[in-house]
Amino acid sequence: MTEGVLLLTTDGDAAHKLTHPSSEIERTYVATVRGDGADAARAAMKGVELEDGLVMPTAVSARRIGRGRWDVELTIAEGKTREVRRLCEALDLEVERLVRTKFGPVKLGTLESGRTRALTARETEIIAALTKSGGKSKNTTGGARRERNHRNSR
C-alpha cells in the first residue's frame, strides 16, 4: 500500500487531468527497500523498460538506512499504475514501504499519517493552471525538467 499525499476532489475533470499519465504531473516517492539502492538509483536514471514502456525518472537518489536497506527517492511524471513498485521490482529491490511525498505542487511535509489539510491558495492556483493546461506546460518543481524519450513495448 502506498501512503502519503492523496488529493481529494469532487472535480472529475481535474482528477482525470491530474492522474492521467499524459499530463506528466510530477510525483515524488520515498521507497524503503531491501537490495542495492545505490546501484538501482544509477540504473533507474538511465531508464528502465517495463511491460508498458520505458520509465525514466526525472530524479533519483538513494540513502543507506541500515544493512541492506535503503531509502530511494524517485520523482516520476508518467503516473502509470503501480509504476514505482514495478520499477523497484525490475531493479531487484523489495519494497517495504512506499510514501508519496509530493504530488505536483503539494508536499507532504510533516503531516502525520491519517491527518488531512486544505490546500493552500498557491497550491490551488497551480493545480488550476495544471488542469487547465493539461499539465505538461507547467513545471511544478520550479527547476529544469529532464527530457524523456518514451517507447512503447507494444
Question: Predicted segment positions?
Answer:
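Basic, flexible Lys/Arg- and Gly-enriched helix-loop patches that mediate nucleic-acid binding at interfaces
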Residues: M1-R154
